[in-house]
Amino acid sequence: MYEFLDRRYALALYEVGEKNQKLEEYINDFGEIVHLLKNDENINQVVNHPQISTSEKKKIFMEIFKGKIDEKLLNFLLLLLEKKRIHDAEGILTQLNKISLEKHNKVVAEVRTVIPLTDNEKTTLASKLSAKYNKIIIFKEIIDKTIIGGVYVRVGDDVIDGTIKFKLESMKKVMLKEE
């Protein structure tokens, strides 16, 4: 349910950013703001304090961010405060990034390996995934020693598990079934 609302807010911010040709700036600045909301104790105290009114919170946000971020992005933050949706900022950022990828015909492929892929392996994997999904592939590489060997790829909800760990677990299940 909240994902739907997050997407609506994200789409509104995306459209404003695109219209003003500041989309990348909005994504980067909003990402930093989300990081602050999660990690800055002072901002957390202000946002979560029940005795600080919404109008006071808005004034504080104006003092913190005015002149440091685009005015339309600041207005977006103030709207989130007013609608009591500031706690959804991380979900909105996630949806904003998804929308940006969709609009630019890109998709993120999470790739887990024991050792980093070579440039040749990345190129080969990117071309195969690009052909399958008909999108530009952006790699999110993760080094994971627990997979023992092979490669694990996740694109959206699709998983391609060619890891030794998976093969060993599959063999174990087959062997235990036969007993």
UniProtKB/Swiss-Prot annotation:
Its localization reads: Cell membrane
GO CC terms of this entry: plasma membrane; proton-transporting ATP synthase complex
Classify the protein's membrane topology as the record does.
Peripheral membrane protein
Q: Which Pfam families match?
A: OSCP (PF00213)
Keyword terms: ATP synthesis, Cell membrane, CF(1), Hydrogen ion transport, Ion transport, Membrane, Transport
The answer to whether the entry has keyword Phosphoprotein is no
Quick check: keyword ATP-binding in the entry? no
Question: Which InterPro entries does the record cross-reference, listed alphabetically?
Answer: ATP_synth_OSCP/delta_N_sf, ATPase_OSCP/d_CS, ATPase_OSCP/dsu
Hey, which family's this protein in?
Answer: Belongs to the ATPase delta chain family.
HAMAP family xref list: ATP_synth_delta_bact
The molecule here is called: ATP synthase subunit delta
Lineage here is:
Bacteria, Bacillati, Bacillota, Clostridia, Eubacteriales
Q: Coding gene?
A: atpH
